[in-house]
Amino acid sequence: MSIHISIIAPDRTVWDANAEEVILPSSTGQLGILKGHAPLLTALDIGVMRVRVDRDWTPIVLLGGFAEIENDELTILVNGAEEASQIDRDQAQRDLEEMTVKFNEATTNKERIEATQNLRKARARLQAVSA
């Protein structure tokens, strides 16, 4: 019993396989998807998506987008995505520290918005490799 998942970024297909369960970072909170889920279209936030295949969970960082589930087909269109296996934990930690400094030093609205997005991305990347 599984659902088919397609994760599509502007530059590539990130994931195209079946899974038993998915947890998405929707704009209203975490959203669990199982076989037989009701049709749904939802906005995605920056965060970590978790995909369960057999008994193994695979974390994938999503950089916002949309997800649609219908007839056990989950299609996810994202601005960007990165599998945890591609992330260096030490670099992710350094990136988080650097983005925290930039966030604290931001003075204009534009700088604050950009720093907030970069900080959220850095947190998600570190969370994905720390799970």
Curated annotation (Swiss-Prot):
Membrane topology: Peripheral membrane protein
InterPro entries listed in its UniProt record: ATP_synth_F1_dsu/esu, ATP_synth_F1_dsu/esu_N, ATP_synth_F1_esu_C, ATPsynth_dsu/esu_N
Top-level taxon of origin: Eukaryota
GO cellular component annotations of the record: chloroplast thylakoid membrane; proton-transporting ATP synthase complex
Protein family membership: Belongs to the ATPase epsilon chain family.
UniProt keyword terms in alphabetical order: ATP synthesis, CF(1), Chloroplast, Hydrogen ion transport, Ion transport, Membrane, Plastid, Thylakoid, Transport
CDD domains in UniProt: F1-ATPase_delta
Quaternary organization: F-type ATPases have 2 components, CF(1) - the catalytic core - and CF(0) - the membrane proton channel. CF(1) has five subunits: alpha(3), beta(3), gamma(1), delta(1), epsilon(1). CF(0) has three main subunits: a, b and c.
Localisation per UniProt entry: Plastid, Chloroplast thylakoid membrane
The protein's role, per its UniProt record: Produces ATP from ADP in the presence of a proton gradient across the membrane.
The protein's name in its UniProt record: ATP synthase epsilon chain, chloroplastic
Gene Ontology MF annotations: ATP binding; proton-transporting ATP synthase activity, rotational mechanism
